[in-house]
């Protein structure tokens, strides 16, 4: 069989087209992921700057002002400094656990962002079990902290890891029960469906008004999960030096630093999605997202507005978290566990029973 030159050229052009098709297919998958990662990184940098400025205002002192205008580049300067610091390893510790621990903490939190709707039609994975996938993934992070504490071969680090695991278990259950109540009210566990269920009734349809007890419990539990004051027992400086972070330096210490703010941001986003209506502005006749389906310009404008609304609600909760840090004193470990097991757990169970009864009688 003889193949002429034109047929060979056709075969080569076809193979090039197939390669370009596969390349653009991979690129189409990577672009949303990379965009989300970039947005999360910028969000964390903004949180660090806001915390320093708000903390300085509460304490009546001057915050960061030299790294960039108004000190906006201070977090970037700190990260660069940690990047070039030496990574020290404990001489008698388990270096494998010591090195893997920070990575597990960061990766488990980053995966949680895949189910968060940042705006109208802006979610990486709209899964039917979105909120419970977040709870399942976030429960992996304390394992990384416990590995870090054990691998450090330091009594303060090990106690900090144990405290982190105990605290996470104590407050994960009330938080899960609150999420289950929201899922029952919305008849779905998808984060997108939960937001759309709230948007049907406007401002008064927010789960903040329908689940006020659950909102307070979720707020307290999320602060405890983020290990923020008054719940920062795993790294209490006066008792444990720095807890599970005591033996860390350089980029590994920076990973814990990033993980704490990533966790704070993801908790704030879930407060917005579950209780504050998500991307919906909740003002009738002002912003109807069905109008944005007319053409691409309206669609992009609608997505931009929805992202802005989501972030505005999220950073409002972040302000409350930062102000709480400098308002309330740290609890003792027995007070922390008693609050979770003897107070929040029974109330969250009662709230779930009331929600279930309401849903059954409304059928």
Swiss-Prot record:
MF term (GO), any: quinone binding
Keyword hit for Methyltransferase: no
Cellular compartments per GO CC: chloroplast thylakoid membrane
Primary site of residence: plastid
Catalytic activity entry: a plastoquinone + NADH + (n+1) H(+)(in) = a plastoquinol + NAD(+) + n H(+)(out); a plastoquinone + NADPH + (n+1) H(+)(in) = a plastoquinol + NADP(+) + n H(+)(out)
Compartment annotation: Plastid, Chloroplast thylakoid membrane
InterPro entries in UniProt: NADH_UbQ_OxRdtase_su1/FPO (IPR001694), NADH_UbQ_OxRdtase_su1_CS (IPR018086)
Record NCBIfam families: PRK06076.1-2
Assembly: NDH is composed of at least 16 different subunits, 5 of which are encoded in the nucleus.
Stated name of the protein: NAD(P)H-quinone oxidoreductase subunit 1, chloroplastic
């Amino acid at each position: 069989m003889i193949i002429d030159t034109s047929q060979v050229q056709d075969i080569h052009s076809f193979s090039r087209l197939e390669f370009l098709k596969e390349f653009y297919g991979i690129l189409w998958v990577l672009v949303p992921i990379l965009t989300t990662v970039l947005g999360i990184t910028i969000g964390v940098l903004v949180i660090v700057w806001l915390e320093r400025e708000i903390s300085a205002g509460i304490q009546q002192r001057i915050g960061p002002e030299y790294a960039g205008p108004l000190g906006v580049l201070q977090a970037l300067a700190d990260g660069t400094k940690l990047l070039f610091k030496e990574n020290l390893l404990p001489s008698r510790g388990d270096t494998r656990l010591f090195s893997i621990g920070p990575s597990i903490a960061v990766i488990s939190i980053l995966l949680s962002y895949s189910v968060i709707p940042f705006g109208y039609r802006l979610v990486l994975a709209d899964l039917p079990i979105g909120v419970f996938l977040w709870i399942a993934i976030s429960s992996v992070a304390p394992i990384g902290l416990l590995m870090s504490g054990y691998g450090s071969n330091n009594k303060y680090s090990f106690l900090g890891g144990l405290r982190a695991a105990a605290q996470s278990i104590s407050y994960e259950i009330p938080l899960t029960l609150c999420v289950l109540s929201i899922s029952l009210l919305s008849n779905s566990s998808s984060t997108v469906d939960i937001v759309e269920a709230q948007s049907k009734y406007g401002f008064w349809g927010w789960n903040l008004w329908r689940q006020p007890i659950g909102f307070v419990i979720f707020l307290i539990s999320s602060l405890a999960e983020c290990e923020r004051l008054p719940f920062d027992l795993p790294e209490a400086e006066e008792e444990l030096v720095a807890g599970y972070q005591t033996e860390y330096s350089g980029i590994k210490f920076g990973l814990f630093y990033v993980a704490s703010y990533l966790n704070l941001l993801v908790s704030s986003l879930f407060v917005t999605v579950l209780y504050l209506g998500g991307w919906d502005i909740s003002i009738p006749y002002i912003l109807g997202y069905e109008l944005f389906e007319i053409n691409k310009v309206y669609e992009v404008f609608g997505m931009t507005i929805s992202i802005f609304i989501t972030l505005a609600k999220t950073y409002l909760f972040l302000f409350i978290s930062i102000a709480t840090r400098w308002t309330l004193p740290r609890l003792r470990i027995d007070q922390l566990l008693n609050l979770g097991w003897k107070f929040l757990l029974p109330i969250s169970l009662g709230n779930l029973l009331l929600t279930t009864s309401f849903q059954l009688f409304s059928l």
